[in-house]
């Protein structure tokens, strides 16, 4: 049976030179304000983007597991759950607070900044920003470790299949799951390695971005541990839109990992391989130089869902004072 026609969010929009990643929590009794504001974000994007369409402003709005139950009545995404912290023999992938994720992108930072401010203004005291990262494109789409990032991203129909929910969860066809982690790099330790040794850590050549042959690629390299296959040998893909970030005055250099996928299980297996090891104890060597300081799993519904969301759960519906007129009663029956 074919899935209904829907409008996915711009998950597969091309990489841009500028991005802002905002993670926020929803305060007590903030559900109604956030619920209303989410339905107006499309209008904000159109209004700000109209000033200069060549800047290709976009945003992907995503909701965490706990927040979903506070914001929406009715069905919930079948695989949405809180991010599970991973504690390995050497490194930890922490789970950190986050109810809302805004992935804002454009050719220039000015419109990203304007949209971020407008979104937060629309939600006011109902939300608290717990993490804000301003990403930028580095030379040749490289991360701050000096390697090209996103080489193995799928494109075209393969990317759509890798990121878009279909018949397996018909209530949310066209939607997507997204993981985020903020990594901070130990540049002094990294730069103490020779280029050849750095290539063994990553599993690719540094200059020309070629994957090392299997006989030269260590089992604990980043590339080796991030190849996930089905039982029949078919490789499972995700779409990464990672961005470098940093503050030179603080000596902070990092990568913001953001991975979109049709099911969270693919990214979760990658993270288990990296932090717990595959086999157990064979952990990703890049973690000796890059420390995860945040971690979250969110759900990116369709534009249709955000523009016309289901009602608030009964427990989160604002209580009207006795004798007051429900404005909703003037709008006809609830959706």
From Swiss-Prot:
Membership in a protein family: Belongs to the DyP-type peroxidase family.
Role description: Cargo of a type 1 encapsulin nanocompartment in situ; this cargo protects against oxidative stress at low pH. When expressed in the cytoplasm (absence of the encapsulin shell gene) it is almost as protective as the intact nanocompartment; its encapsulation has a modest yet significant effect on protection against oxidative stress at low pH. A heme-dependent peroxidase, it probably does not have deferrochelatase activity. Converts guaiacol and H2O2 to tetraguaiacol, also acts on 2,2'-azino-bis(3-ethylbenzothiazoline-6-sulfonic acid) (ABTS).
Region spans: Targeting peptide: 312-335
Record remark: domains: The C-terminus (residues 312-335) targets the protein to the encapsulin nanocompartment.
Group of enzyme by EC: oxidoreductase
Record-linked InterPro entries: Dimeric_a/b-barrel, Dyp_perox_C, Dyp_perox_N, Dyp_peroxidase
Lineage, broadest ranks: Bacteria, Bacillati, Actinomycetota, Actinomycetes, Mycobacteriales
PANTHER family: DEFERROCHELATASE/PEROXIDASE, DYP-TYPE PEROXIDASE FAMILY PROTEIN
Gene: dyp
SUPFAM superfamilies linked to this entry: Dimeric alpha+beta barrel
Protein name in UniProt: Dye-decolorizing peroxidase
GO cellular component: cytosol; encapsulin nanocompartment
Subunit: Homotetramer, presumably also in the encapsulin nanocompartment.
Enzyme Commission number(s) from the entry: 1.11.1.7
Top-level division of the source organism's lineage: Bacteria
Cofactor: heme b
Positions with a binding annotation for heme: 222
Phenotype when the gene is knocked out: No change in ability to grow on an exogenous siderophore (mycobactin), suggesting it does not have an iron-chelating function. A double dyp-enc deletion mutant cannot produce encapsulin nanocompartments, cells are highly sensitive to H2O2 at pH 4.5 (mimics growth in the phagolysosome), mutants exhibit significant dysregulation of redox homeostasis, survive less well in C57BL/6 mouse-derived bone marrow cells and are more sensitive to pyrazinamide treatment in infected BALB/C mice.
Cofactor, how bound (note): Tetramer binds heme in a 1:1 ratio. Addition of hemin to purified protein yields a tetrameric protein.
Subcellular location: Encapsulin nanocompartment
Catalytic activity: 2 a phenolic donor + H2O2 = 2 a phenolic radical donor + 2 H2O
Catalytic residues in the record: 149
């Amino acid at each position: 049976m074919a899935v209904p026609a829907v409008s996915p969010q711009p998950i597969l929009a091309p990489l841009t030179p500028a991005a802002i990643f905002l993670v926020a929590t929803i305060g007590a009794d903030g559900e109604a304000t956030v619920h209303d504001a989410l339905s107006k974000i499309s209008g904000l994007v159109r209004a700000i983007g109209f000033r200069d369409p060549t800047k290709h402003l976009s945003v992907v709005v995503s909701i965490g597991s706990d927040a979903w139950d506070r914001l929406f009545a009715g069905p919930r995404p079948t695989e949405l759950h809180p991010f599970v912290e991973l504690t390995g023999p050497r490194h930890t992938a922490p789970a950190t607070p986050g109810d809302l994720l805004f992935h804002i992108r454009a050719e220039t930072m000015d419109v990203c900044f304007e949209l971020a401010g407008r979104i937060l203004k629309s939600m006011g005291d109902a939300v608290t920003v717990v993490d804000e990262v301003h990403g930028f494109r580095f030379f040749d789409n490289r991360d701050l470790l000096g390697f090209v990032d996103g080489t193995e991203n799928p494109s075209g129909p393969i990317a759509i299949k890798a990121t878009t929910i279909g018949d397996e969860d018909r209530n949310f066809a066209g939607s997507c799951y997204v993981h985020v982690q903020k990594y901070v790099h130990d540049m002094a330790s990294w730069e103490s390695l020779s280029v050849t040794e750095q290539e063994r850590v990553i599993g690719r050549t540094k200059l020309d971005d070629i994957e090392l042959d299997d006989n030269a690629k260590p089992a604990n390299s980043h590339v080796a541990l991030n190849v996930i296959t089905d039982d029949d040998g078919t490789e499972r893909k995700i779409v990464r839109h990672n961005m470098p970030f940093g503050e030179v005055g603080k000596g902070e250099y990092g990568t913001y990992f953001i991975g979109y996928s049709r099911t969270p299980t693919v990214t979760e297996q990658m993270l288990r391989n990296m932090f717990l090891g595959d086999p157990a104890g064979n952990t990703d060597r890049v973690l000796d130089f890059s420390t995860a300081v945040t971690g979250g799993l969110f759900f990116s519904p369709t534009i249709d869902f955000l523009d016309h969301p289901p009602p608030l759960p009964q427990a989160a519906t604002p209580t009207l004072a006795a004798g007051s007129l429900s404005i909703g009663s003037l709008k006809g029956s609830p959706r």
